[in-house]
Amino acid sequence: MSHPALTQLRALRYFDAIPALEPHLRDWLLLEDSMTKRFEQQGKRVSVTLIREAFVGQSEVEEASGLLPSEARYWLREILLCADGEPWLAGRTVVPESTLCGPEQVLQHLGRTPLGRYLFTSSTLTRDFIEIGRDATLWGRRSRLRLSGKPLLLTELFLPASPLY
């Protein structure tokens, strides 16, 4: 199963450098903290609609080429992050199989738990970069994060109902 928002997410084109942005957009797109937490600060109940969680081969995560280690399998998680039931963000997480050892194995068992609830409680979380992307009408971003030095790639597309707009 897929979702049209995930097709748009995969179509994002990334800027080579951070573009000039209105302060409001910049505040959302370059947020270093948890997007889940930011949505909750809007006074909303945040929930996850799980679209897909599975191991996939390299051909299904081509956008990660050059950003993650080359491996035979990756854990792929695709979700909609909803605020009071309304989709605000489409998310796609690509995790190399080698990252899934030790405590990071929990990434395979998040189910309907927002990724941010796990990531941003870890004292071992670091972020290598944030890249800003855009399709015809929507903004997005991707980040390479590390847990205990082990990488994962998180891509987020802000949907029309999101307070980013």
Curated annotation (Swiss-Prot):
GO molecular function list: chorismate lyase activity
SUPFAM superfamilies found in the cross-reference section: Chorismate lyase-like
Pfam families: Chor_lyase
Alphabetical GO biological process terms: pyruvate biosynthetic process; ubiquinone biosynthetic process
EC number: 4.1.3.40
Keywords: Cytoplasm, Lyase, Pyruvate, Ubiquinone biosynthesis
Protein function: Removes the pyruvyl group from chorismate, with concomitant aromatization of the ring, to provide 4-hydroxybenzoate (4HB) for the ubiquinone pathway.
Subunit structure: Monomer.
Protein known as: Chorismate pyruvate-lyase
Protein's organism: Salmonella arizonae (strain ATCC BAA-731 / CDC346-86 / RSK2980)
